Amino acid sequence: MTATETVRVRFCPSPTGTPHVGLVRTALFNWAYARHTGGTFVFRIEDTDAQRDSEESYLALLDALRWLGLDWDEGPEVGGPYGPYRQSQRAEIYRDVLARLLAAGEAYHAFSTPEEVEARHVAAGRNPKLGYDNFDRHLTDAQRAAYLAEGRQPVVRLRMPDDDLAWNDLVRGPVTFAAGSVPDFALTRASGDPLYTLVNPCDDALMKITHVLRGEDLLPSTPRQLALHQALIRIGVAERIPKFAHLPTVLGEGTKKLSKRDPQSNLFAHRDRGFIPEGLLNYLALLGWSIADDHDLFGLDEMVAAFDVADVNSSPARFDQKKADALNAEHIRMLDVGDFTVRLRDHLDTHGHHIALDEAAFAAAAELVQTRIVVLGDAWELLKFFNDDQYVIDPKAAAKELGPDGAAVLDAALAALTSATDWTAPLIEAALKDALIEGLALKPRKAFSPIRVAATGTTVSPPLFESLELLGRDRSMQRLRAARQLVGHA
């Protein structure tokens, strides 16, 4: 690649299932590298498997990238010079490339059945599970005609080179597969439909992809891709072989790869809990890369400025939910309070949680919990006491704080608040401190815990005086009186 050529990377998932955090990590690294280099981020859908692919999963991929803010320069709903960007719409392109590969002798029709291949291995004293033996390379025209007359439907296989296949992996360094270690591989099904082994490198060539950043699990397929790229160059379809970078595996518990069965692998499960994009992307960036040894908290702009694929670590990265949560909490605290309020309202609305406060009061309540939550979903437990239909005194909290000692506290609090001239947090605080700390000589925890339980139903809530102000005089007094009845007469 010359200095004048632009980096072109691609993210090309198959639309199956729910977006996996490992998949999103791959998208993030590709996106960040494109933005860092001033290059192009191509989003391509590999939907050639009609039995597994679904429109629902396709739409989920679009939703995931949009929620995360990973915008694409070319791809679905955006277009671009090398479209279409869904492989299911590129069948004619693949048929043309196949015809050219066959005409040039780079590929051939293979008629052998798996049983025939295995039988030949056994007859030759080889391991029967070695895979295809390149037998059909040397068929005569008469043999091919005979197979066709039998009604056999051939697959198309690429003729692998007789040389070593090697590349300098941008993450792992030099990698070599010895000549003969990779057999001729199928480019099509017997039906003639193209396989991933054809369409993926073919699209990379036609879309002029310069760098392929993908998961380590795909490294064994790289020799086949190199060989096909070489053939595509020889027939005039490709201009270059892209540079490869194989990103480290994301692990779950122990040493096992994070699988779709692991709850933390589901991107939308994190969103449903209340992760914000900034927090999740920050954590995913750390799965194989770091901005600095002592600097784990950063935003996308910082990542883009610093990211180079050459700095990606080759060692597996373990998904640590606690660390992800901690980073998300930090990013929530960093949000402008107005921005946080909007996001919190949207999250609660999405999950059917309505807080019985007007807009101004909700904004004030949001500010109270912003530094007290890890994910947006935590706010519901802290704020639901504002809803009369959700308010209930927790029995454990009542047993702890609304015992005999609580009666005197509630009596004094009710007396002090009844005579309060204004219902604001500073005046509420002053009245209660005067009555309970000065008047009853109580320590703050003993003074205010019974009031907290009475007003909110729990021992954990937003700041007490501000909560009472937002709850309002009437509802606050009603709840304190009801709690006093629970305590009984002192």
Swiss-Prot record:
A motif ('HIGH' region) lies at residues 13-23. The keyword ATP-binding applies. One of its GO terms (molecular function) is zinc ion binding. Keywords: Aminoacyl-tRNA synthetase, ATP-binding, Cytoplasm, Ligase, Nucleotide-binding, Protein biosynthesis. Its EC number is 6.1.1.17. SUPFAM superfamilies: An anticodon-binding domain of class I aminoacyl-tRNA synthetases, Nucleotidylyl transferase. Gene3D superfamilies: 1.10.10.350, Glutamate-tRNA synthetase, class I, anticodon-binding domain 1, Glutamyl-trna Synthetase, Domain 2, Glutamyl-tRNA Synthetase, Domain 3, HUPs. Belongs to the class-I aminoacyl-tRNA synthetase family. Glutamate--tRNA ligase type 1 subfamily. Monomer. This is Glutamate--tRNA ligase. It comes from Mycobacterium bovis (strain BCG / Pasteur 1173P2). The gene is gltX.
